[in-house]
C-alpha cells in the first residue's frame, strides 16, 4: 500500500518507520529541509510515562490566575480573541475536574507505557544511538505541601503498575549526586526508575536515515497546501503545482494539523509554546546524572552526553515562536539554582517550539470519518514519550491488525457526542500529581 505521511517530526518519522517495516511504500513530506526541525528539535529530552498527565487538572484554573502575577510562572496566557483559542481554552476548562482528569491520565499513561516498550524494542532491533540514558526521572519538591501531596497521590502510579520511590531531601543525592550541595533547598522527590532520556532530534534524524534505507522516501522543502477530497476519501495532497497520490494518508503535522484539516475533520489541537536552553557541560560531576523535574516551575533539566537541556513552561499565545528574554531568565534561574557549576550558561542555545496540545491532553491517533485518512497528532509535551507507541499503533490500525493496547478512545471519535469507549478500569479517584 502507498502511504503518504505529512510531517517529519518524531511522530511522523516513527510512523514512517513502523509502516515501512510492514512493507508499505511510504513517502514523508515536510516544508522543512530535514527531519525534526520544529517541535522535535529542542524539547526537554524526557521519556516519562510515569509523569504523563494532562495540563487540564483540578486546581489549574485557580493556579493560572495566581501565575499571572508571578515572574517565573510555568503557564502564561495571551488572549488574541481568535475563535480557535477561545474554543480550545473553554474545552480545556471543561476537562479540569477530577473525573475528566482521571480518564484522560489513564489514556495517556496507557499509551506512554506502551510507547516506552516500543522504544526499547526498536533500540534492541536497530542499535540506534541518541545519547539516551535509562537512569529514571526525579521530580523535585521545594515545599512540604508538594511532598505531602505526592505521598497522597502515588496511588495513581500503583494503579498503572509504575514503580516509584518517594525520597527525602537527604536521599536525593543517592540518585542525583550533584544535588547534595542544594539539598537544603528541597523537601524531597519522587523517583520513577523506569523512565528514560535522550536527544529527540538526534533520534529522529537517525531513525529517518534508517527508514530511508528501508525504502521510505522523504520529500523536504515542500509545502503542503491542501488535502484533495473525492467522495468519502482523500484523493491526493496538493503541494504547489504537484498532486501526490497514495492509498492512505497520515496527518502528523503537529500544531498545524488543525488548519490543514479544516473543513474535513474537526480536531481540537492548539499550539502550546515551550522553551529550552542547551548548555555545554563544564563539570560532569556537577551536572545531572539523568533528569530532574522542578515541580515548582515545571522545568526539566536533562543530561545528554556533553550537554544539559533545560526545558519547560507553557504559553497559550497562538503560533508565536518569538524568543522571550523573560523565559530565558526563568530557565537560567532554575538551572543555576540546582546545578550552579554544571555548565557554561553563557554559551547556551535558546529555543522555542509549539507543542500540539489537545484540551484533554491525550493525542489523537487513528482513523477519521474519511476512510483513507489517519491522524497521529496532538501529543502536546509528550511527543517524544509517546512517539514510538503512536507509530506502532497507527501501523497496526492501517494494517488492519488489532493493536496491543486499547485504542478506540485515542482516536478523534472520542470527541463525538455519545461516544462510548471500551470498558477500561479507571484510575483511583484521587487528586492529580501536579
UniProtKB/Swiss-Prot annotation:
Cofactor(s) for this UniProt protein: FAD
Pathway assigned in UniProt: Amino-acid degradation; D-alanine degradation; NH(3) and pyruvate from D-alanine: step 1/1
GO CC, one annotated term: cytoplasm
SUPFAM superfamilies: FAD-linked reductases, C-terminal domain, FAD/NAD(P)-binding domain
One example of a Gene Ontology biological process annotation: D-alanine catabolic process
This enzyme's EC code(s): 1.4.99.-
Keywords from the UniProt entry: FAD, Flavoprotein, Oxidoreductase
UniProt KW Signal keyword: no
Protein function: Oxidative deamination of D-amino acids.
PANTHER family attached to this UniProt entry: D-AMINO ACID DEHYDROGENASE, SARCOSINE DEHYDROGENASE-RELATED
Family: Belongs to the DadA oxidoreductase family.
Protein name as it appears in the record: D-amino acid dehydrogenase
Protein source organism: Yersinia pseudotuberculosis serotype O:3 (strain YPIII)
The encoding gene: dadA
Amino acid at each position: 500500500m502507498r502511504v503518504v505521511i505529512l510531517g517529519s517530526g518524531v511522530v511522523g518519522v516513527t510512523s514512517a518507520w513502523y509502516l515501512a517495516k510492514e512493507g508499505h511504500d511510504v513517502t514523508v513530506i515536510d516544508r522543512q529541509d530535514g527531519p525534526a526541525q520544529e517541535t522535535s528539535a529542542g524539547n526537554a529530552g524526557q521519556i516519562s510515562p510515569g509523569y504523563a498527565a494532562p495540563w487540564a487538572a483540578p486546581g489549574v484554573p485557580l493556579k493560572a490566575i495566581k501565575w499571572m502575577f508571578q515572574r517565573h510562572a510555568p503557564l502564561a496566557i495571551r488572549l488574541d480573541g481568535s475563535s480557535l483559542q477561545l474554543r480550545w481554552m473553554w474545552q480545556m476548562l471543561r476537562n479540569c475536574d477530577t473525573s475528566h482528569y482521571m480518564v484522560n491520565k489513564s489514556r495517556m499513561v496507557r499509551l506512554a507505557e506502551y510507547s516506552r516498550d516500543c522504544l526499547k524494542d526498536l533500540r534492541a532491533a536497530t542499535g540506534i544511538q541518541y545519547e539516551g540514558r535509562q537512569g529514571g526521572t526525579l521530580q523535585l519538591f521545594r515545599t512540604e505541601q508538594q511532598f505531602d501531596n505526592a505521598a497522597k497521590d502515588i496511588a495513581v502510579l500503583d494503579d498503572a503498575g509504575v514503580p516509584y520511590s518517594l525520597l527525602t531531601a537527604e536521599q536525593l543525592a543517592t540518585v542525583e549526586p550533584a544535588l547534595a550541595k542544594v539539598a537544603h533547598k528541597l523537601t524531597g522527590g519522587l523517583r520513577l526508575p523506569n523512565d528514560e532520556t535522550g536527544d529527540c532530534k538526534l533520534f529522529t534524524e537517525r531513525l529517518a536515515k534508517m527508514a530511508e534505507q528501508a525504502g521510505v522516501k522523504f520529500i523536504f522543502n515542500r509545502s503542503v497546501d491542501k488535502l484533495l477530497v473525492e467522495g468519502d476519501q482523500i484523493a491526493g495532497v496538493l503541494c504547489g503545482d504537484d498532486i501526490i497520490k497514495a492509498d492512505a494518508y497520515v496527518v502528523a503535522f503537529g500544531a498545524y494539523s488543525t488548519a490543514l484539516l479544516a473543513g474535513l475533520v474537526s480536531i481540537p489541537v492548539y499550539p502550546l509554546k515551550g522553551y529550552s536552553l542547551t548548555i555545554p557541560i563544564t563539570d560532569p560531576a556537577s551536572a545531572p546524572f539523568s533528569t530532574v523535574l522542578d515541580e515548582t516551575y515545571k522545568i526539566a533539566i536533562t543530561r545528554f552526553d556533553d550537554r544539559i537541556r533545560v526545558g519547560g513552561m507553557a504559553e497559550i499565545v497562538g503560533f508565536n515562536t518569538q524568543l522571550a528574554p523573560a523565559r530565558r531568565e526563568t530557565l537560567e534561574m532554575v538551572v543555576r539554582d540546582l546545578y550552579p557549576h554544571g555548565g557554561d550558561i553563557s554559551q547556551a542555545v535558546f529555543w522555542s517550539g509549539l507543542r500540539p496540545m489537545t484540551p484533554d491532553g491525550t493525542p489523537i491517533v487513528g482513523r477519521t470519518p474519511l476512510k483513507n485518512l489517519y491522524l497521529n497528532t496532538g501529543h502536546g509535551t509528550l511527543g517524544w514519550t509517546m512517539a514510538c507507541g503512536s507509530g506502532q499503533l497507527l501501523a497496526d490500525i492501517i494494517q488492519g491488525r488489532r493493536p496491543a493496547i486499547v485504542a478506540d478512545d485515542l482516536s478523534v471519535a472520542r470527541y463525538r457526542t455519545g461516544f462510548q469507549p471500551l470498558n477500561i478500569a479507571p484510575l483511583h479517584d484521587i487528586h492529580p500529581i501536579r
